[in-house]
């Protein structure tokens, strides 16, 4: 790390990039970055920190910079290209993260689903008991002075997490996703097993995942779940409209009764993983209980607001398994209300590869609406549309546009769940605006 340089982030509004920028800023380094001008949910944290965010322009690149390049951008990006031509140090995001975690007790959280929620929960709990730095995929990052722990989200896309060698790893699940890169479940498993062989102390893995049960590694693997064969087990789970309580056992030793104000079975499992890490780091269980009960969640993961007589939930879910978990959480908290799903499919390749599974998960809602497919920077077109998915949905499937969100006005005293990893929030904002105007008119 160099105090004389300015760290310039190409794509600073990316969720991981913004978190990394905040960490370096906290550590006292000079930080700036560039990105698209469109507003993103990560932007607020950068603005509050006073970090300069510029529009993309090769004129941003000059002597004295160390460039950290976001993984969405190729080496042909004008800023990255100019930096290389000038001989400036250029790191990819995951490479820089691999160097940054050295010198701490590091815990990487990997998995096709549940990474961000579990990373956020672990960061919150450990921060409450010891100095902790963290990087979360919701754009949150903190570089705490003299930190004992470094908690980070380990992204499997293009095997980027292999640039890190953590002390511990939590593996929430292995599932087929990112079909633009991975060829199938065996390819995904191969990436996770390679990561497992880089872990230094121990792995905490969900016991009901058949792929995770196959892991071959040089360090112990501790399984967590609800089965008698799991090393860390949740028993007597009670789910209510205020959250969940459960007893935790480790090899039949009772560790305590825990309470979380989170919803869905997946959050009980995420909490178990956090408890397991804390146990091996000899953290007091009473402190863990307090911190777990105090956690409110991470950005864009079951984020709620009330407007008129409606409950609006914003969630990052963009894979069938995530949609199922989010709708399960909504049912737990609002068992007597109608659940309406508004889903923005994310990337053409994922929509094609998982179409039947998307339809199956979405049909768990009482009514389903879709938006057009969100195309990523890596994939701008494809041979599929939301209409193809709509044909497989039995609970509706009408396609909404930002200019006309009025079909949602047919629902009253209900829950609308907006899901997607693209810009689904613009549909959410359009609906909220429509609802607000209607409320004012009626009053």
Swiss-Prot record:
Residues that bind ATP, according to the entry? Answer: 111-117
Could you tell me where this protein is found in the cell? Answer: Cytoplasm
**Catalytic reaction equation(s):** UDP-N-acetyl-alpha-D-muramate + L-alanine + ATP = UDP-N-acetyl-alpha-D-muramoyl-L-alanine + ADP + phosphate + H(+)
Q: Which UniProt keywords apply?
A: ATP-binding, Cell cycle, Cell division, Cell shape, Cell wall biogenesis/degradation, Cytoplasm, Ligase, Nucleotide-binding, Peptidoglycan synthesis
Pathway listed for it is:
Cell wall biogenesis; peptidoglycan biosynthesis
Where does this protein chiefly localize? cytoplasm
The protein's GO terms of the molecular function aspect are: ATP binding; UDP-N-acetylmuramate-L-alanine ligase activity
One Gene Ontology biological process: cell division
Cytoplasm listed as a keyword:
yes
List the Pfam families hit by this protein, alphabetically.
Mur_ligase, Mur_ligase_C, Mur_ligase_M
On whether Nucleotide-binding is a keyword of this UniProt record, the answer is yes
Q: Which NCBIfam families did the record assign?
A: murC
What family is this?
Belongs to the MurCDEF family.
Q: What is this protein called?
A: UDP-N-acetylmuramate--L-alanine ligase
Q: Which organism is it from?
A: Levilactobacillus brevis (strain ATCC 367 / BCRC 12310 / CIP 105137 / JCM 1170 / LMG 11437 / NCIMB 947 / NCTC 947) (Lactobacillus brevis)
């Amino acid at each position: 790390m160099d105090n004389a340089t300015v760290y310039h982030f190409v794509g600073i509004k990316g969720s991981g990039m913004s978190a990394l920028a905040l960490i370096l800023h906290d550590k006292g380094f000079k930080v700036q970055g560039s990105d698209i001008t469109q507003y993103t949910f990560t932007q607020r944290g950068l603005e509050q920190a006073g970090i300069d965010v510029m529009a993309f322009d090769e004129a941003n690149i000059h002597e004295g910079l160390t460039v950290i390049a976001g993984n969405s951008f190729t080496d042909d990006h004008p800023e990255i290209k100019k930096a290389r031509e000038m001989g400036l140090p250029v790191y990819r995001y995951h490479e820089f993260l691999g160097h940054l975690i050295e010198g701490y007790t590091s815990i990487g959280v990997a998995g096709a689903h549940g990474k961000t929620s579990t990373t956020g929960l672990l960061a919150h709990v450990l921060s409450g008991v010891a100095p902790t730095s963290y990087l979360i995929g919701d754009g949150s990052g903190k570089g705490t002075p003299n930190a004992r722990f470094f908690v980070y989200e380990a992204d499997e896309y293009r095997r980027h997490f292999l640039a890190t060698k953590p002390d511990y790893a939590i593996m929430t699940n292995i599932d087929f996703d990112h079909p633009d890169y991975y060829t199938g479940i065996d390819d995904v498993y191969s990436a996770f097993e390679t990561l497992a062989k880089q872990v230094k102390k121990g792995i905490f893995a969900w016991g009901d995942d058949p792929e995770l049960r196959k892991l071959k590694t040089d360090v112990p693997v501790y399984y967590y779940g609800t089965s008698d064969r799991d090393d860390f087990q949740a028993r007597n789970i009670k789910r209510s409209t205020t959250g969940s309580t459960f007893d935790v056992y480790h090899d039949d030793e009772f560790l305590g009764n825990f309470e979380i104000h989170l919803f869905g079975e997946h959050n009980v499992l995420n909490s178990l993983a956090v408890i397991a890490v804390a146990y091996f780091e000899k953290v007091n269980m009473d402190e863990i209980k307090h911190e777990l009960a105090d956690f409110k969640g991470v950005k864009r993961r079951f984020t709620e607001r009330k407007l008129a007589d409606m409950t609006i939930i914003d969630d990052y879910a963009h894979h069938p398994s995530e949609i199922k978990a989010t709708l399960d959480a909504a049912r737990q908290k609002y068992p007597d209300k109608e659940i309406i799903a508004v889903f923005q499919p994310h990337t053409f390749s994922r929509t094609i590869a998982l179409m039947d599974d998307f339809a199956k998960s979405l049909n768990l809602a009482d009514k389903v609406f879709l938006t057009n497919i969100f195309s990523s920077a890596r994939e701008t077109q494809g041979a599929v549309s939301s209409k193809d998915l709509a044909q497989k949905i039995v609970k509706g499937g009408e396609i909404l546009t930002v200019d006309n969100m009025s079909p949602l006005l047919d629902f009253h005293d209900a829950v609308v769940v907006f899901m997607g990893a693209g810009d689904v929030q613009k549909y959410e904002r359009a609906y909220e605006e429509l609802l607000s105007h209607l409320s004012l008119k009626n009053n």
